Structure formats: C-alpha cells, structure tokens
C-alpha cells in the first residue's frame, strides 16, 4: 500500500454542454494505490508540471500517507525529454523532497501502467457516458461524488471487497 500509478486522461468533449466553449479542454488526473485499487481523481484545465505537483500534494492528503513509489508514463507533465538535459522536472523535485522513487514506464507501453489505464476505461463507461457539465467547478463536484461511489464498488481482483474495504483490511494488519 505504498505504490501509486498516476496518469492523465482527456475529459471527452461530448460531456460539455452546448453553451460552453468547445475549444476548452479538461483533464482528469488519476492516482491509484496499487495494493488496494483505491483511487483519487482531480480535474484541471491543463496537464502541466505545476498541476502534477499540485495533484500529488492533493493525493497525499487524500490517502493520508506519502507513497514509497510513483509510476507514470513519459508525458511532459511527469518528466522532461532529452532537450531539457540538466533541468530537473518539478515532479522529480517534489519526489526527491519527499523521498519518493519516481518510476517511468518505457515509451509506448501503456500496459505497464495497466491499473490506472483500466480505471480510465471504467471511468468512460461508468461516468463520462452519463456526464454533462458547464464549468470546471461543476465537473469537479460531479467527479467527487463519482469518486466516492467508485471506491465503494466491489472488485473481483480484491476478492469482491471494495477498494476502501481492502485498505481497511491492509491497515488492520500493520
């Protein structure tokens, strides 16, 4: 219960109500605890290094612990490419400050971040298919309610416990 997978997904444009700016994009940041499958979600108008740092700080508050490891893909919100040699990415600075190991998966291998990728497919099926919103605040409010439900859905991989129940079970052993 100390390893996270983090990723970002686009919020489908079909969710935005007609009177809203269609050029506007929204992004869902997702953090999943690998042991419990408990998730934290938060939405932004951009996927940037600064928002990544903000998201990790929010996730630490949500989970109430600092992970030992975080695994991400190689998106610019998580790491710099070779053109930034010599510069330290803001996420890596935060990880260093908090003594978190940052693992980056090999390029073009999203299956290596499979838990968070699968959770994004579930979000499309369970949430975005039925969602409509006009503002970022409305998206965040509806998303928070969805997150509460999501962490209370039994999962076969957890022996039909919910992510919240699995976390309680693991914490009772420590």
What do the predicted segments below correspond to?
Residues 24-25, 41-65, 69:
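Active-site beta-loop-alpha junctions of metal-dependent nucleic acid enzymes
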Residues 37, 70-73:
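Buried hydrophobic side chains on well-structured beta-strands
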Residues 37-42, 103-105, 129:
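Short small-residue beta-strand/loop micro-motif enriched in glycine and branched aliphatics
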Residues 2, 98-100, 122-174:
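C-terminal domain-tail junction helix/linker
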Residues 1-30, 38, 54, 62:
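Mobile-element integrase/transposase regions
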Residues 73-74, 82-85, 89-95, 101-125, ...:
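RNase H-like two-metal-ion nuclease catalytic core shared by retroviral integrases
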Residues 1-12, 76, 89-95, 162-171:
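Basic, flexible linker segments flanking DNA-binding modules
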Residues 8, 34, 46, 74:
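Residues immediately flanking
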């Amino acid at each position: 219960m100390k390893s996270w997978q983090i990723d970002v997904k686009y919020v489908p444009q079909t969710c935005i109500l007609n009177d809203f700016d269609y050029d506007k994009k929204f992004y869902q940041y997702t953090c999943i605890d690998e042991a419990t499958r408990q998730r934290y979600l938060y939405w932004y108008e951009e996927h940037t290094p600064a928002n990544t740092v903000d998201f990790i700080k929010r996730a630490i508050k949500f989970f109430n612990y600092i992970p030992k490891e975080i695994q991400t893909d190689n998106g610019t919100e998580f790491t710099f490419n070779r053109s930034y040699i010599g510069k330290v990415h803001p996420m890596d600075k935060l990880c260093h400050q908090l003594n978190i190991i940052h693992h980056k998966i090999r390029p073009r291998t999203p299956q290596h971040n499979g838990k968070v990728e699968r959770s994004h497919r579930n979000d499309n099926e369970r949430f975005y298919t039925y969602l409509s919103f006009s503002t970022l605040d409305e998206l965040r409010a509806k998303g928070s309610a969805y997150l509460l439900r999501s962490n209370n859905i039994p999962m076969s991989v957890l022996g039909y416990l919910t992510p919240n129940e699995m976390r309680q079970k693991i914490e009772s052993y420590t």
